[in-house]
Amino acid sequence: MNSLPSFSERHQLRLTLMALLSLSLNAPTLAQTAPPPLRRLIVADASHAMPANHEGLGLQWQGLPELDRPALRSLLSTALGQPLTPATVQALVTALNSELAATRERFSVASVPDQDVSQGQLRIVVTRGRLAALRISGAADADAISRQFDAVRGDAAIDAAALDTTLAWIDRALPGRNSEARFSPGAQPGAVALDLQVKEPDRLTLSAGADNTGSPVTGTRRVSAGLTINRLLGSNDQAGLRISGDPSFGHSRSWQASYQVGLPWRHVLSLNANGGSIHGRMPEPLDLRGSSSGQSLRYEIPLRLTGPWTDSLTLGFDHKRSDNNLLFSDTPVTQTVTDIGQFNASYGAERPDALGRTRITATLTVSPGGLFGHNDDDAFSATRAGAQARYQVVQLQLERGTPLGALHWQSQLTLQQASTNLLGSEQLNGGGMSSVRGFAEGAGYGDSGWLWRNELRAPSSAGPAGLVLTPSLLLDAAQLRVHSAQPGEPARRHLASAGLGLTASGPGKLSLSLQWAQRIKSGVPSQAQHGSRLHVSLQWAGL
């Protein structure tokens, strides 16, 4: 969304020039005699009629209580007693318009109507901007988007903050939607015309990928395919389905379905479900199989959609069921059925600044235990020694993007603190492409600890066959802590790596990511101290 407030600047300049011309025509004696001192300054809403009496001196407000603030009153009062010259008038009008631009009234304009100022009285009027015309192009459902502006259109003055929030919500309601707002003055004083150009995401998108992020138990090579449908049931919803597994789908296969909808009261509801089955690679006659499933609900309440900080509060619930710990374990494998039932609350905030962009996410997860048949300490401790069904987890994520000349530094820090031993799916993962690179996927887990990932990206350059190449330097580290270590189990593990990355984006929405890292510090016995690993991901963004 891109708004162009220069409309008000052009309108302000036009009215100011007209005001100065009006003063020169209505008070010709000012050019021949000394200008009178300013004795009375009236700042009025343009819709208020000029009072019949002219009694009283000093600064007076008519119908503008939101502007009658001490700082502005003090600024305008300094002109009282000063010669009433065109320069004085222009300074007063400029001060008022600057104040309007900094408040919710940036579509309102201060100007000077025709009047006789020979007696030292000046009347400045504020014309409130009102949304008189709205034209929408490119939208799949223009009527639905038009209804979002009902609260800011009509004869009422435009609330600039409310209008900005409406424009931001139009984009937020449907992932992938982008809109651009252009404002222009209407034919009547105060009239504002809004042209909104909307670029909708494709109705149907296909995608596919291949990588080596699989578990050693089921094979590291993985393939996936996905389908995304926008505007499935309405103008602001999105549904998705993705399947993945090993290339033969004989050892690992899983699916994930999602649905998100922007609600009429400007909240976001998300539903997710997943399931999968695993056939571990075991020497005969051993056989190891398992399955898992999960459902989650998220309800996001945007708090500030515009401004220096944008933030939101998200409430949710997760249910996870598994009869194995094959994929989330560096402890002995078990096949005990467990149910996880947990509530979570998350606060996220983002702020761009002159040096980059910062994002903060704080999440509290609480499991009361006893919500399902296998949501108890017996099932949990049978899967992992010391695990309890009742727990609390606090996680804090800090992300920072900082341009450094031609380079770009992207950094992410995750902190986690748990109240007890957790099942593997809730632990902090310390190895793999999305964790400490250079280590095998799921090389280490911790109930608490920290994870720090860094990329220093060089400028992109043109490569062969139309590819765009972006090289980078990688530096990752983590500390994983076990809440209650078992005999022979290390209470802390440290992991660190450094390496090189290369992203190649090509025609046809193909992208290839190569990330090679060498281990600097390894607290995982199965991962040699100075070993290395190449992480590969090939993705097709689809039609």
Outline where the language-model segments fall:
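Periplasmic polypeptide-binding modules associated with outer-membrane biogenesis and secretion
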Residues: 32-214, 244-253, 394, 413-414
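Transmembrane beta-strand segments that form the barrel wall of outer-membrane beta-barrel proteins
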Residues: 181, 204-214, 225, 236-247, ...
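Residues that define the transmembrane beta-barrel architecture of outer-membrane proteins
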Residues: 190, 219-223, 251-253, 291-295, ...
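Repeated loop/turn-to-beta-strand initiation elements of outer-membrane beta-barrel proteins
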Residues: 204-206, 233-239, 265-271, 306-311, ...
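Membrane-embedded beta-strand positions of outer-membrane beta-barrel proteins
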Residues: 206-208, 227, 239-243, 269-273, ...
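Outer-membrane beta-barrel "beta-signal"
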Residues: 227, 297, 502-504, 509, ...
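Transmembrane beta-barrel wall of Gram-negative outer-membrane proteins
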Residues: 250-351
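C-terminal outer-membrane beta-barrel translocator/porin domains of Gram-negative envelope proteins
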Residues: 323-483, 522-527, 537-541
